[in-house]
A protein has these predicted regions:
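Catalytic cysteine-centered active loop of the rhodanese-like fold, especially the PTP/DSP P-loop
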Residues: 149-202
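Bacterial N-terminal signal peptides
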Residues: 8-17
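Positively charged, proline/Ser/Thr-rich regional signature most characteristic
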Residues: 92-95, 103-165
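Pro/Ala/Gly-rich low-complexity, hydrophilic intrinsically disordered segments
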Residues: 66, 205-208
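Short, glycine/charged-enriched secondary-structure capping and boundary segments
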Residues: 129-132, 180-183, 207-208
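Flexible, polar/low-complexity N-terminal or interdomain linker segments that lie immediately upstream
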Residues: 22-116, 120-127
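Bacterial N-terminal signal peptides that target proteins for export
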Residues: 1-8
């Protein structure tokens, strides 16, 4: 009977020892395995469709118009800009009008005769644009650049001073087309349109 009790005590001690070893391995031998957490479900964003916006987050025409007419607090001037050509521009131009991408598309849809003059000179251009980067040069309305501008405008309009003349460069942060438009206004053209949004707005509208 005493021998049987001794065996029971030995068995209990072995059981406790194994349990302690297993517990020690769980605590110090490495991290205990936790149940895998479920990955968060992706949130689906609605595809923009209002106002002509394309899939992928491209702005619609209404949004583009707001961007193109943004007021940066820069006063409009009748004088040629002689500072940095890449910076915020006025939201208007004396003697001319700001035309938006929506307005450009309306002109095309109604097939209104007009002349587009590219004052940027980048590889990406608006369709049928006349090269005129040099029109952006600062100076005065009596300098040789103005004389040359008068000759070019006479040629592309065939002498019709009421033909819509559209000047563009890169974006509302580009003064080059502003200067070119001022030269046309000073030359006596009555329908000068400054496409302030430029080639960047044109591309954002999905145009090529």
């Amino acid at each position: 009977m005493r021998r049987f009790s001794t065996w029971l005590l030995l068995a209990a001690a072995l059981t406790l020892g194994v349990s302690g070893i297993v517990h020690a391995q769980d605590s110090f031998g490495g991290p205990r395995k936790m149940p895998a957490k479920e990955a968060p479900k992706p949130t689906l964003k609605p595809t923009p469709t209002a106002d002509g916006a394309r899939a992928g987050g491209a702005p619609g025409l209404d949004q583009l118009t707001q961007m193109e007419r943004a007021d940066y607090g820069i006063p409009a001037s009748r004088m040629l800009h002689d500072g940095e050509m890449h910076g915020p521009t006025p939201s208007s131009i004396p003697g001319g009008q700001v035309v938006t991408t929506q307005g450009m598309l309306d002109l095309q849809r109604r097939k209104v005769p007009h002349v587009i003059i590219d004052v940027l000179g980048a590889p990406e251009q608006l369709p049928n644009a006349v090269p005129g980067v040099w029109l952006a040069q600062p100076g005065s309305f009596t300098d040789p650049v103005q004389t040359r501008a008068v000759q070019l405008l006479q040629q592309v309009t065939q002498g019709q001073r009421d033909v819509p003349l559209i000047f563009y460069c890169r974006s509302p942060y580009c003064w080059m087309s502003y200067n070119a438009a001022l030269r046309a206004i000073n030359a006596g053209y009555s329908n000068v349109l400054w496409y302030r949004g430029g080639v960047e707005s044109w591309k954002m509208a999905g145009q090529r």
